[in-house]
Design a protein with these regions (language model features):
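A broad, low-specificity signal for short, low-complexity segments enriched in glycine/proline
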Residues: 56-63, 111-117, 133-136, 180-181
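Aromatic/acidic polysaccharide-binding cleft in carbohydrate-active enzymes
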Residues: 37-38, 99-125, 141-180
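Conserved glycosyltransferase catalytic-site signature
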Residues: 4, 137-138
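Aromatic-anchored helix/helix-loop segment that forms the rim or "lid"
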Residues: 66-70, 76-79, 117-137
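Active-site-proximal helices and loops of the catalytic beta/alpha 8
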Residues: 1-97, 143, 160-192
């Protein structure tokens, strides 16, 4: 209850300062209790986007700590997970949910496409780059840019940056060495997103 009261007070202060401000929370699990219109507006969409997309397209857990053959390419599991978790989001929360493929905590999506379980603490950084699948990355981008929500690109994903989970996922941006084909694909998909919305 204290947590809920804090967020109600927080929302009141924020909305008084700027009624248009968006209160977006990082949350794992069902956020429904905080999305009743008096606390958060939306969430970083792990459960209804990042995790199901990752399992479906790569079979990997988002930290690259586990590979699950039973979830790789399993359309029933993907659809069921998406439907189940999307139910906990009101329409306005769904359309503002932060749909990420990668972020500052998890392995890069492009690295997950190589289906290699590992972390940089016991594997070389080069292992995160070996055998990545750009076709799968493009499939993920297409889903990200056409799915309901706010597609959020973690810096470097558009340029082909790889990396296992934190801290390897925080590599520097490859200025002048970007993957031009991937960058071009991102631009095309962003244009489609802007034109038709999600």
């Amino acid at each position: 209850e204290f947590n809920h009261q804090f967020w109600k007070d927080f929302r009141k202060a924020v909305k008084e300062a700027n009624p248009e401000a968006l209160i977006l929370a990082e949350h794992y699990g069902n956020p429904e209790g905080w999305l009743q219109g008096d606390e958060w507006d939306s969430v970083m969409n792990y459960d209804a986007f990042m995790e199901p997309v990752t399992w479906f397209l790569t079979g990997m857990e988002k930290h690259s700590d586990e590979y699950r053959e039973d979830l790789y390419g399993n359309s029933d599991a993907f659809i069921n997970a998406m439907k189940n978790h999307m139910r906990s989001l009101h329409m306005s929360a769904l359309h503002t949910a932060m749909n990420e493929l990668s972020n500052h905590d998890h392995s890069r999506f492009l690295t997950r496409t190589n289906r290699t379980v590992g972390r940089v603490s016991y594997m070389s950084p080069e292992a995160a780059e070996r055998n990545v699948d750009y076709a799968v990355m493009r499939e993920a981008i297409a889903i990200q840019m056409t799915w309901p929500g706010a597609p959020t690109v973690y810096y470097g994903d558009e340029a082909g940056v790889c990396g296992f989970t934190d801290p390897d996922n925080r590599r520097t941006y490859p200025w002048g060495r970007e993957n031009k084909e991937l960058l071009s694909f991102y631009k095309k998909m962003i244009a489609i997103h802007k034109k038709v919305g999600s």
